């Protein structure tokens, strides 16, 4: 989403999107759902490779579909916000390097959070990537990080997705850094 917007801003073709006969809500939703589509395409291509390389089994298809959708939606909405705010690709790289990658690394991807000190466990439970990773882990292993973590993750990530959509919508509707 961010690359799409930056490319259009830099090339000057963002006006085609701004003055198209669709509402800001429709444009926001379309841009984010394009990211969701890319997320599902990556999953569809990756799963056969995973099956070939490792002995994996999907134990909860509903969780896999939900977490693929919600994770792609959140990252697409966040990407749209970054694409609206930033004016160059360096800004996207900075957000990726200083926010996305560190949050991913401290999300419990490579370890379970019960190995961490208590205060870091609490901090991990505020990290949306923790709930995304936990949801995917549950899809394949049906293991929860803590009792009710899947339910908490569904609620937390849904609220975050709605909030990010709203933020992207408001920035796009206002034309922040794209109507100048």
Q: What do these predicted ranges mean?
A:
Residues 172-180:
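Short cytosolic juxtamembrane segments of multi-pass membrane proteins
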Residues 54, 107-162:
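Membrane-interfacial helix-loop-helix junctions in multi-pass membrane proteins
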Residues 24-96, 146-169:
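Alpha-helical transmembrane segments and their short interhelical loops
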Residues 4, 13, 47-48, 81, ...:
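A residue-level signal for alpha-helical anchor/packing sites in multi-pass solute transporters
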Residues 3, 7, 51, 55, ...:
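Transmembrane helix-loop junction
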Residues 1-22:
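Transmembrane helix boundary and interhelical loop/hinge segments in multi-pass membrane proteins
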Residues 69, 95-106, 123-126:
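Hydrophobic transmembrane alpha-helices
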């Amino acid at each position: 989403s961010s690359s799409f917007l930056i490319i259009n801003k830099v090339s000057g073709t963002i006006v085609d999107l701004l003055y198209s006969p669709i509402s800001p809500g429709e444009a926001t939703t379309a841009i984010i759902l394009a990211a969701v589509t890319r997320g599902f395409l990556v999953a569809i291509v990756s799963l056969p490779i995973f099956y070939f390389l490792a002995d994996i089994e999907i134990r909860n298809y509903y969780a896999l579909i939900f977490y693929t959708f919600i994770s792609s939606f959140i990252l697409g909405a966040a990407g749209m916000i970054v694409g609206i705010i930033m004016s160059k690709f360096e800004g996207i790289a900075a957000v990726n390097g200083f926010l996305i990658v560190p949050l991913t690394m401290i999300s419990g991807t490579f370890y379970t959070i019960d190995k961490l000190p208590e205060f870091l466990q609490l901090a991990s439970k505020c990290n949306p990537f923790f709930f995304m990773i936990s949801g995917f882990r549950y899809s394949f292993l049906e293991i929860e990080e803590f009792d009710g973590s899947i339910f908490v993750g569904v609620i937390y990530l849904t609220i975050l997705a709605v909030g990010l959509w709203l933020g992207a919508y408001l920035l796009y509707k206002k034309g922040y850094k794209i109507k100048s």
